[in-house]
Amino acid sequence: MENAFEKAYQKEQQAIAAFDAAKNDKEKEEARKLHYEAIAKIDNFGKSAIHIWREYQSSREHGNLNLNLSEVIWDEQVPEIVACMKANGIERFTFSATYTEAIKTAWLFQQEGYVLEGFVEINSRYTDAYGNSKKVPALQFRVK
């Protein structure tokens, strides 16, 4: 299954490049349309999609190939987030959140159909003084 978030991300990157290359207002407006098309598709994925989208964008912008979930996820959000990820082709993701109940959230991901593969090191959204992403440990999951 195609990763719909990656497809939207690529379209968003095209929109940004088109906007940066635009030489007049008409070309800028065309670039904006591309942006709105990418975002509109995400909006159609459901309530949890915007949360996933923000995390997906951040993950890709910092050089990660997979979605990294780093923000707080409440227990009751897990089934909907997992359903959205599965329905839209997220086969692998990492989880680097460090809040108090994060281990329970990781357990819930497994209960909802993702298998823990182990630890990996990823680029976080935080950067050092030189603009390099800081490396952080994360749990990697794949769909069953």
Question: Predicted segments — roles?
Answer:
Residues 103-115:
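Short, aromatic/basic amphipathic alpha-helical patches
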Residues 82-84, 105, 130:
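Generic structural signal for short, flexible, solvent-exposed coil/loop and linker residues
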Residues 92-96, 115, 140:
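Ser/Thr- (and often Asn-) enriched beta-sheet segments in non-cytosolic proteins
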Residues 116-144:
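C-terminal edge-of-domain segments
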Residues 33, 107-109, 123:
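General "foldedness" signal
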Residues 1-101:
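An N-terminal amphipathic alpha-helical segment
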